[in-house]
From Swiss-Prot:
One of its GO terms (molecular function) is ATP hydrolysis activity. It catalyses: taurine(out) + ATP + H2O = taurine(in) + ADP + phosphate + H(+). Transmembrane segments: none annotated. Disulfide bonds: none annotated. SUPFAM superfamilies: P-loop containing nucleoside triphosphate hydrolases. ATP binds at G40, P41, S42, G43, C44, G45, K46, S47. InterPro entries: AAA+_ATPase, ABC_transporter-like_ATP-bd, ABC_transporter-like_CS, ABC_transporter_ATP-bind, P-loop_NTPase. This is Taurine import ATP-binding protein TauB.
Amino acid sequence: MSRLTAEAISLSFEQRGQRRAILRDLSLGLAKGESLVVLGPSGCGKSTLLNILAGFQTPDQGRVQIDGRTLEGPGGERGVVFQDDALMPWLNALDNVALGLRIRGLGKAERTARARQVLQLVGLQEYAEQSVAELSGGQRQRLGLARALAVEPDFLLLDEPFGALDALTRERMQVLLLDLWKQTGKGLFLITHSVDEALFLATDLVVMDGPPARIVKRLPVDFARRYAAGETVRSIKSDPEFGRLRQALLDEFLDVAEAEHAH
C-alpha cells in the first residue's frame, strides 16, 4: 500500500537578522485509505508542513518520500485543495477540471470524459457549463475537490478547505469528503483548527503546537471509519465518546494557551 512520509523535516527563515524555526525535526506519515488530520492553532506551522508535503516548499533538512522514493517538487501522486479555491474565473466548471489534465498531455476527448466523471463524483454534473462566478462557496469547493481528483492522485492534501464556508455547508462538505474517501480509497492529509472537524474526518489525529511546530499528541480515531461503515452522522456526533474526546482536546488547547500567557 502506497505511503507518504515526512522524515525529520526542519525549516526556518530569516526574520530581523535572526533565524526563526517554523518546523523542527518533524516526522509523520500516512498510507492510502487513511485520513490523517492535523489539528492546531493558527500560525503553528500546519500550512507550511502541507506545502512541504505538496512540494511547494523545500525543507532545510529532512525529506518527503512515497514508498521510499524521495520527492522533489509537486507531482501527480498528490492533489492539493486550499481554502482559497484558486479556480480560473474565466473558465467554466468543466474546463477548470480539465485544465490540469490538459497540462498532463491528455487529449481533448479523454480529458473531457474524465472531467465529467469527477464532476459527477462531487455532485456538480449539472453545473459543468456554469462559470465559476455563478457557483456558491460550497460548489466552488466541490469544484476544487473535483480538480484535485481528476489527476487521480494517491493522496489528497487539504489546507483548511472548508474554513470559509457557513456551518451547514461545512458539515455537508465534510460528509462529501468522507464519501469520496470511502469510494476512492485515497489517503487524506487535512489541516484544520476545528476540533469537531478533526474528530469526524480523521482515522489518525495529530495535535500540533508551535512555532516551531511540535506534535503534542497523536491518537487513533474511529469516527470516520464508522461513517464509512454506514453509521449516521447524528449517531456519531451524539456518541458520548465523541463529546469526551472533543472536551479533552479543547482542554488541551486551553492548557497550552494558559501556559503561553503565563510566559
